[in-house]
Every structure is written in C-alpha cells, then in structure tokens.
Regions:
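Gly/Pro-rich hinge or "lid" segments in bacterial periplasmic/extracellular proteins
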Residues: 14-72, 76, 86, 190-192, ...
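Short helices/loops that flank or line small-molecule/ion binding pockets
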Residues: 85-97, 113-114, 142, 236-245, ...
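Append "and occasionally in soluble cytosolic enzymes with long acidic Gly/Pro-rich linkers
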Residues: 139-240
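Acidic-aromatic pocket-rim loops
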Residues: 260-287
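Ligand-site clamp/hinge motif
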Residues: 36, 64-109, 248-250
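Periplasmic-binding protein-like
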Residues: 120-132
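Short, well-ordered beta-strand elements
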Residues: 7-9, 46-49, 59-60, 75-81, ...
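A ligand-binding cleft/hinge motif common to bilobed small-molecule-binding domains
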Residues: 102-114, 277-282
Length: 287
C-alpha cells in the first residue's frame, strides 16, 4: 500500500522468525522478475548507497537521501578490505578511522595500551569448527575418539589465540542462553586415555619414529584450512598436540573457496571453518 507505506507479506506457512530474517544481512528483498547482478551491483536498504565496488580492495558509499530512519551522519564512507595482518597497522598509521575483527591478540594488546585508540571487545555468535571425515583413514571410531580426547581446546583458546575464543562443545555459542551450560563434552581432554584407546586398538609405533602405524604404514592425516580468524593457528596447535599422540598431521593451507569445494567433495581428513551460527538470533537456523 503506497499511500499507507505498508507492505503485506503472505506466507505459505507460519514462520515465527520472519522479522528477524528480514533484518539479517544475508537476506535481500528483490523483485523476482528483475534482472540483477548482485555480486557487482548490490541493492540494499541501509543508510548508505554503493557508488563503487572492488571485491579485492574497496567499497565506496554515499549518504542515502531516501533512508527511512532519520538523518545519516556522514556524506561519504570508504570501506577498505584489509588483510588480518594489516588492520592494526593501518589504524596506527592513520590510514583508517575504524577497523573491525582484529583477530591478533598481540595487536589488540598493543592498541589497548595506546591512549589514542578505543578497543571494544564483545561476545559474538561466530563459531570455529573442525570437521572429521568419517571415511578413509578416520573411519575407525577408536581413532576418531582418541583424536578428540588428545586436543586441549581450553589451552588453544586461552594461549594459542590469546583468549579470543571460548572452548566450545556445540554449534550454538556460549554467548546465548540456550542451555549451553548444561551440555557435556563426551570427549574431555585426556591424553593418557587417548593413548590407551589407540594402544588397545592396535595403533602402535613399532619402529620408534614417534608416529603410530596402521596396517604397517604411519598414520598421516591431511588437514585442510584457510586463513581466517586464526584458523591456521588452531590448525598448527592441533598438529602439535596430535604429534604427542603419535599422529602425523599434514597441514594444507588454501583459499576459502578451494577448501569449501574439497570439503563438499569429501577430499580431506580434517578441515575447519568459521561461521556465524545464529545470524538472526534463532537457533533453528542452524538445527
């Protein structure tokens, strides 16, 4: 209704979280009969309108004079796409006014100590995942269970990435009140128990090289990863901890697209990813 400036949405079935979905940036309202190139010319409803876009370097925006929710504070906004290693430096050099998602604990500590900057850290709903391929070399239950028991997630979160993560046991983050505190990890960290599991299953180091064997060959696992929010740091920590168990881990680092394709194809032993799990605030999105 143009006069009343209202929109009526008719659904095929009830959807309690519809309003949250409409506010989630992943969802876009479009005319289905239109012809769009959203990858290069996105259409939004926010306070700024896109004027130029380069997926590798920068997005330039201007004030949206039709914005529905009051005065827009800035006439122009430039968003630079920086690597994780360059964000803090760009801020310190005065090249940018604001940065988000600094994932280096050392960079954050440096900025905290500098009175020229305000550092804000909050709990989010993003989770880091490690996936185990239950086919191939890791098809044996005992081997998979031992791997999980051999990993000290608490130390990885507190030391490896400087406390930027919280140890997780669910796809739902601890920052939400969805009963997370009642969950129990069935594979609590216990190196001795993990080693006994492998010994009892017959996976032993018979030649003294520090690596256990399966069918006469060293157990070597391929771990695929990509550089995002310290995933590579976790991969290296897992590699180190599993070596103590007697398992060799080969890390194969690549871009996110290649890793995703290999994961879908099942061409990995271990892999990781990093996702916002409840973007609209409703856990049913991920269940």
């Amino acid at each position: 209704d143009d006069d009343a400036r209202t929109l009526t949405i008719v659904l095929k079935q009830a959807k309690a979280d519809l309003r949250k979905d409409l506010a989630y940036p992943v969802f876009v309202i479009l005319d289905v009969s239109g012809d769009y190139d959203l990858a290069e010319n996105p259409i939004g409803t926010g306070p700024y309108a896109l004027t130029s876009f380069d997926s590798k370097t920068k997005a330039t925006l201007v004030k949206n004079k039709y914005y529905w929710n009051g005065e827009v504070p800035y006439d122009n906004v430039e968003i630079d796409f920086l690597s994780e290693d360059n964000k803090a430096m760009a801020l310190q050099n005065g090249d940018v006014n604001l940065v988000e998602n600094i994932t280096s604990a050392s960079d954050l500590e440096t900025l905290k100590k500098d009175d020229n900057f305000n550092v804000s850290i909050g709990q989010g709903v993003r989770c880091g995942f490690a996936y185990i391929n239950e086919k191939g070399i890791l098809k044996d239950d005992a081997l998979r269970q031992a791997l999980q028991m051999a990993l000290d997630h608490k130390t990885m979160c507190e030391v490896t990435v400087g406390g930027l993560y919280t140890e997780g046991i669910s796809v739902l983050p601890s920052s939400l009140a969805y009963g997370y505190d009642n969950l129990k990890n069935p594979y609590e960290f216990n190196t001795d128990k993990a080693k006994k599991l492998l010994d009892d299953a017959g996976y032993k180091d018979t030649d003294g090289d520090g690596i256990r064997e399966m069918n006469g060959k060293n157990i070597s696992i391929r771990y695929i990863t990509y550089e995002n929010r310290r995933l590579s740091d976790f991969a290296q920590a897992i590699q180190t901890q599993l070596k103590d168990l007697g398992i060799d881990v080969k890390i194969d680092s690549m871009n996110a697209d290649k890793e995703w394709n290999l994961m879908v194809a099942g061409e990995y032993d271990l892999c990781d990813s990093n996702w916002i799990t409840v973007g609209n605030g409703d856990p049913t999105e991920y269940l």
